[in-house]
């Protein structure tokens, strides 16, 4: 993987201290999507990871909301289905719902029954790996539908939160950041 491409993406990230609450150092990935070159690099690097780290993916599951920014494009380029995992009351029909803890709150995820067939090989994608709570909730949804979880793919990992240690499936991240908890953080 080219250091120039990785550095280009890293230079697009913007940090916001004390957002969404005091003690959190928020990593804003949105500038990547405002730059067509950066977005193209992101998709190319994610596709390279899919092709080298994970085999024969049938479904890419994207987590609300920022997993939706690149999940469908990645699924299209990888020639597989895209399935959204959303907050409750955002999807119609029969759903499977699980609750989970995030680095600064509690939430729930839902997936439509029948969107993943038993035995399909599933890769979960999201923007940031923090505590691993959202990924674990998505793991449970995939498993309940009978999918075979092959791994997780993230744009950025906040290493000080050690979310990777909670995940059982192979995990790949393009970028790493925040090796230590921010000063004044509840995680310090």
From Swiss-Prot:
Enzyme class: transferase
E.C. numbers: 2.4.2.7
Binding site for AMP: 130-134
Transmembrane segments: none
Cofactor(s) for this UniProt protein: Mg(2+)
Subcellular compartments: Cytoplasm; Nucleus
Pfam families the UniProt entry points to: Pribosyltran
Xref: PROSITE patterns: PUR_PYR_PR_TRANSFER
The organism's place on the tree of life at top rank: Eukaryota
Chief location bin: cytoplasm
GO biological process, one term: AMP salvage
InterPro entries to which the protein is assigned, alphabetical: Ade_phspho_trans (IPR005764), PRibTrfase_dom (IPR000836), PRTase-like (IPR029057), UPRTase/APRTase (IPR050054)
Gene Ontology molecular function, alphabetical: adenine binding; adenine phosphoribosyltransferase activity; AMP binding; metal ion binding; pentosyltransferase activity
Pathway membership: Purine metabolism; AMP biosynthesis via salvage pathway; AMP from adenine: step 1/1
GO cellular component: cytoplasm; cytosol; nucleus
Gene3D superfamilies, per database record: 3.40.50.2020
Keywords: Cytoplasm, Glycosyltransferase, Magnesium, Metal-binding, Nucleus, Purine salvage, Transferase
Statement: the UniProt record of this protein carries the keyword Nucleus: yes
Record family assignment: Belongs to the purine/pyrimidine phosphoribosyltransferase family.
Functional note: Catalyzes a salvage reaction resulting in the formation of AMP, that is energically less costly than de novo synthesis.
Subunit description: Homodimer.
Protein name from the UniProt record: Adenine phosphoribosyltransferase
